[in-house]
C-alpha cells in the first residue's frame, strides 16, 4: 500500500489508464491531431470522426441522441450555459428561476449573477436529508417561472434527488428543468428518455476522464433553445464556439463508455468499501452521518465528529486525502453552506469530513484510513475541554461564554 491514500474522489478522479491511452493517440504528429472543423483534408475528417464517436459514447450512457450533446469546458460552463442560455432566451416569457440552497457554486453564483440582471430566484431549503422534494418545487412554481435547476446527486453529502418525479411536475407545467449531473454520471443510472429533463450538465473529471472537458445535454424533443455565452465560429450548432479539443473529447467519450460497462459492478464494490469503512468508525461516540441514510450514492460518506474541529482532524490525517466541505469552497473558513442548509449547527458543520471512494480504492486503504480516523478523533478529543465537559454531562449549548 502506497501513502498518501486518496479518498477524495468526489473532488476529482485520476484518469483511467485506458482513457489516457486513447487520449495520447490524438496528440502527436503521427496521431489524430487535426482540427475537427477542417473540412478540406483527411486530418480534419479523422478528428471530426473521433469527436462524433465521443459524442455518441456520452449520449449512450444517458440514452440521448448524440445531436443533443454539446461540448463545453466542464460542468461549470455547462451550468452557466444552461442557466444564462435559458434565462436570456426565454426572458420575455418570465423572469423567475427556482433552485436550491445546496447547489454547487457553479449554479448558485450563476443564479446570483442573473439576479443582478433583474431575474428573480427562489432558493429552496432542502430537508435535513439533503433532498429537495417535488412538493417543495411545486409550492415555489409561479406563472412566470421559466426554469428549475437542481442537482441529481449532492457533491458534499451524496444524497440523490428524485429527478423523475420533479421532471414529471415541471414538464406538466411547461417549465424547463436543468439538472447538474456532475456527481451522478457513472454512479446512478441516467435515462433522459425516462427522466423528463430538458438540460443536463456533465463533467469528465468526475468519471475518470480528463479535466477541462464537459458536456451539456440539450433536449431536442421537446426542443430547448439557448442563447450562447461564448461566440466565435459557431461551433456546436452555434451554442458553444471554440476549436474542439479532440484528445479531451475522446477521453470523455472513453470514460463514459467504460462507466456504462462497469457501473453496476463498480457500485457493488464501492458500497462494500464504504460499508467496511463506516463499520470500523461507527463505534466512535457522537458520530453523525450527513445527508440521507437511504437515498445516497455509496461513493460519498460525509461524517461529523462532534467536539473535533474538522480542520485539525484533516491535519492529523496527513497520509489520507479527504476534504471538509467541497473542493471549491474548502479554502474558506466558513462552515459548509450545504451542511448549514441541512440544519446542522456550526459545531457539527465545522467537524465534518467527506470521505469519497472510487475505482482505485482498495480494502487495505479503507482499513488503514478507518484506523487512522479513530486514532485521530480519540486523540483530539483527549485534548478538548469541551469533550471533558460533555463526558461530565454538561450541556454545552446552554453555557454562556464570557466575552473578554
Swiss-Prot record:
Cofactor(s) needed: pyridoxal 5'-phosphate
Subcellular localization(s) per the UniProt record: Cytoplasm
Keyword entries, A-Z: 2Fe-2S, Cytoplasm, Iron, Iron-sulfur, Metal-binding, Pyridoxal phosphate, Transferase
Record SUPFAM superfamilies: PLP-dependent transferases
Signal peptide residues on this chain, from the entry's feature table: none
PROSITE patterns: AA_TRANSFER_CLASS_5 (PS00595)
Gene3D superfamilies: Aspartate Aminotransferase, domain 1, Type I PLP-dependent aspartate aminotransferase-like (Major domain)
UniProt modified residues of type N6-(pyridoxal phosphate)lysine: 206
Record keyword Metal-binding present: yes
Function: Master enzyme that delivers sulfur to a number of partners involved in Fe-S cluster assembly, tRNA modification or cofactor biosynthesis. Catalyzes the removal of elemental sulfur atoms from cysteine to produce alanine. Functions as a sulfur delivery protein for Fe-S cluster synthesis onto IscU, an Fe-S scaffold assembly protein, as well as other S acceptor proteins.
Subunit structure: Homodimer. Forms a heterotetramer with IscU, interacts with other sulfur acceptors.
Protein name listed in UniProt: Cysteine desulfurase IscS
Species lineage: Bacteria, Pseudomonadati, Pseudomonadota, Gammaproteobacteria, Pseudomonadales
Record gene name: iscS
Amino acid at each position: 500500500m502506497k501513502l498518501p491514500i486518496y479518498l477524495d474522489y468526489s473532488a476529482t478522479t485520476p484518469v483511467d489508464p485506458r482513457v489516457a491511452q486513447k487520449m495520447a493517440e490524438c496528440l502527436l504528429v503521427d496521431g489524430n491531431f487535426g482540427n475537427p472543423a477542417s473540412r478540406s483534408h483527411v486530418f480534419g475528417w479523422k478528428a471530426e470522426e473521433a469527436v462524433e464517436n465521443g459524442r455518441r459514447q456520452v449520449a449512450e450512457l444517458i440514452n440521448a441522441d448524440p445531436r443533443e450533446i454539446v461540448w463545453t469546458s466542464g460542468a461549470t460552463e455547462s451550468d452557466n450555459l444552461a442557466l444564462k442560455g435559458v434565462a436570456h432566451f426565454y426572458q420575455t416569457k418570465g423572469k423567475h428561476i427556482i433552485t436550491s440552497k445546496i447547489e454547487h457554486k457553479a449554479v448558485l453564483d450563476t443564479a446570483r449573477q442573473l439576479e443582478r440582471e433583474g431575474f428573480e430566484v427562489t432558493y429552496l431549503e432542502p430537508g435535513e436529508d439533503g433532498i429537495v422534494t417535488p412538493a417543495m418545487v411545486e409550492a415555489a412554481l409561479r406563472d412566470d417561472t421559466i426554469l428549475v435547476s437542481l442537482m441529481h446527486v449532492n457533491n458534499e453529502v451524496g444524497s440523490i434527488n428524485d429527478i423523475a418525479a420533479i421532471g414529471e411536475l415541471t414538464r406538466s407545467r411547461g417549465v424547463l428543468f436543468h439538472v447538474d449531473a456532475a456527481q451522478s454520471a457513472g454512479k446512478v443510472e441516467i435515462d433522459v428518455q425516462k427522466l423528463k429533463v430538458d438540460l443536463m450538465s456533465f463533467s469528465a473529471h468526475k468519471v475518470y476522464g480528463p479535466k477541462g472537458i464537459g458536456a451539456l445535454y440539450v433536449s431536442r424533443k421537446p426542443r430547448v433553445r439557448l442563447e450562447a455565452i461564448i461566440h466565435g465560429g459557431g461551433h456546436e450548432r452555434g451554442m458553444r464556439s471554440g476549436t474542439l479539443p479532440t484528445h479531451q473529447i475522446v477521453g470523455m467519450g472513453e470514460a463514459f463508455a467504460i462507466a456504462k460497462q462497469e457501473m453496476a459492478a463498480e457500485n457493488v464494490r464501492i458500497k462494500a468499501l464504504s460499508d467496511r469503512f463506516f463499520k470500523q468508525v461507527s463505534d466512535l461516540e457522537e458520530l453523525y452521518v450527513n445527508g440521507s441514510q437511504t437515498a445516497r450514492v455509496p461513493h460519498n460518506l460525509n461524517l461529523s465528529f462532534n467536539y473535533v474541529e474538522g480542520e485539525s482532524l484533516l491535519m492529523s490525517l496527513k497520509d489520507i486525502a479527504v476534504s471538509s466541505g467541497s473542493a471549491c469552497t474548502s479554502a474558506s473558513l466558513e462552515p459548509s453552506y450545504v451542511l448549514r442548509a441541512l440544519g446542522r449547527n456550526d459545531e457539527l458543520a465545522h467537524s465534518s469530513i467527506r470521505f469519497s471512494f472510487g475505482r482505485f480504492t482498495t480494502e487495505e486503504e479503507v482499513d488503514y484510513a478507518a484506523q487512522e480516523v479513530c486514532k485521530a478523533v480519540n486523540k483530539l478529543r483527549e485534548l478538548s475541554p469541551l469533550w471533558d465537559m460533555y463526558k461530565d454531562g454538561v450541556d454545552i449549548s446552554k453555557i454562556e461564554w464570557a466575552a473578554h
